[in-house]
């Protein structure tokens, strides 16, 4: 069965159903996979008295001829007693006044569809519906990145899975280029009526060398078995990273010789926009190419040279090269 994007939305809203007598709070849709379980946090309000009958239907349909709901009965509890579910998969963990929490363990693909909570008090009846989506295999978590990542600035990476269930422990683990990271990751779960999820947050101070690297969040079962994963490629904004090459390599020449300096841009994100050369900290005029050629040098051109390349993040500067121009005694 195709999973309808469980990572796309964190169910922060409530599903409300309200007649003049009934009100419910629960996640609108719950997600699980074959063999796992579903924990359905649920609260309700019945103003006319205590709950007398509760039936959990699978894909209920109202029959106008009988004025009753038809569908598979997964669980039933009346004032006369409880009717156990098949293999006791379904547990009603609520009460007769405000709690309608349910558990289905194990859950199967054919449980997907609509769950109907048929509630009856002494004078009122209500059918509350909850969507259940069960995939054949464990669905992947989803890595959430901040809008922009910049070198040396701490960011938080979030790995989110729209699943959590008591009695079915899982673990989210972080990897960078296949190497485990995330010893300081903060893990949390929610089984509230507002949302059901498992989350891991990793604080990370990326360097420019992390640009283009692969970050993975893996989902593991209680036995450590790999279940699924999500991967992203880091886009780390950084200033240009430079290296300067000189010919001759020792940067020692005689007056009248020529010198060539090349500014190599090993990395720049985003692409660089300007190039300049400096001698002893002062910009050289009309020198805005990656190659600087000095023809027939004089002793006055001895000094420290470097290149500076800028992008939208800022300027990057190479190491300095000391050019030594030898000359005859005057």
From Swiss-Prot:
According to its UniProt entry, one GO biological process term is: regulation of B cell proliferation
Its cellular-component GO annotations read:
early endosome; external side of plasma membrane; extracellular exosome; recycling endosome
The reply on keyword Repeat is yes
Report a single Gene Ontology molecular function: sialic acid binding
Instruction: Give each disulfide bond as a residue pair.
Output: 37-165, 42-100, 159-217, 263-307
**How is this protein situated with respect to the membrane?**
Single-pass type I membrane protein
Instruction: List residues in topological domain: Extracellular.
Output: 18-330
Domain (Ig-like V-type) spans 18-136
Q: What is the top-level taxon of the source organism?
A: Eukaryota
Per UniProt, subcellular location reads as: Cell membrane
Binding-site residues, N-acetylneuraminate: 118
Q: Say what the protein does.
A: Most highly expressed siglec (sialic acid-binding immunoglobulin-like lectin) on B-cells that plays a role in various aspects of B-cell biology including differentiation, antigen presentation, and trafficking to bone marrow. Binds to alpha 2,6-linked sialic acid residues of surface molecules such as CD22 itself, CD45 and IgM in a cis configuration. Can also bind to ligands on other cells as an adhesion molecule in a trans configuration.
Q: Of which family is this protein a member? A: Belongs to the immunoglobulin superfamily. SIGLEC (sialic acid binding Ig-like lectin) family.
Protein name in UniProt: B-cell receptor CD22
Tell me which species this is from: Pongo pygmaeus
């Amino acid at each position: 069965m195709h999973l309808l994007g469980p990572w796309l939305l964190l169910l922060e809203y409530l599903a409300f159903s309200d007649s003049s007598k009934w009100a419910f709070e629960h996640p609108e849709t719950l997600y699980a996979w074959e063999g796992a379980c579903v924990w359905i946090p649920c609260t309700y309000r019945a103003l006319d008295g205590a709950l007398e009958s509760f039936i959990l239907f699978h894909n209920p349909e109202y029959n106008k001829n009988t004025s009753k709901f038809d569908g598979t009965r997964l669980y039933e509890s009346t004032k006369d007693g409880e009717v156990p579910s098949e293999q006791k998969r379904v547990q009603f963990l609520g009460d007769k006044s405000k709690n309608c929490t349910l558990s289905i363990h194990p859950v199967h693909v054919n449980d997907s569809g609509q769950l109907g909570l048929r509630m009856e008090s002494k004078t009122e009846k209500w059918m509350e519906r909850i969507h259940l989506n069960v995939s054949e295999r464990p669905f992947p978590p989803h890595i959430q990145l901040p809008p922009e990542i910049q070198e040396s600035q701490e960011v938080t990476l979030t790995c989110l899975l729209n699943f959590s269930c008591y009695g079915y422990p899982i673990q989210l683990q972080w990897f960078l280029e296949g190497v485990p990271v995330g010893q300081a990751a903060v893990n949390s779960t929610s089984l509230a009526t507002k949302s059901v999820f498992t989350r891991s947050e990793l604080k990370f101070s990326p360097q420019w060398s992390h640009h283009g690297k692969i970050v993975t969040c893996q989902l593991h079962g209680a036995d450590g078995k790999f279940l699924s994963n999500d991967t992203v490629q880091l886009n780390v904004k950084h200033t240009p990273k430079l290296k300067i090459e000189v010919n001759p390599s020792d940067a020692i020449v005689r007056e009248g010789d020529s010198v060539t300096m090349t500014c190599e841009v090993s990395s720049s994100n985003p692409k660089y926009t300007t190039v300049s050369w400096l001698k002893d900290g002062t910009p050289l005029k009309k020198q805005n190419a990656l190659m600087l050629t000095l023809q027939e040098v004089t002793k006055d051109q001895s000094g420290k040279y470097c290149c500076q390349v800028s992008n939208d993040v800022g300027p990057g500067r190479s190491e300095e090269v000391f050019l030594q121009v030898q000359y005859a005694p005057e």
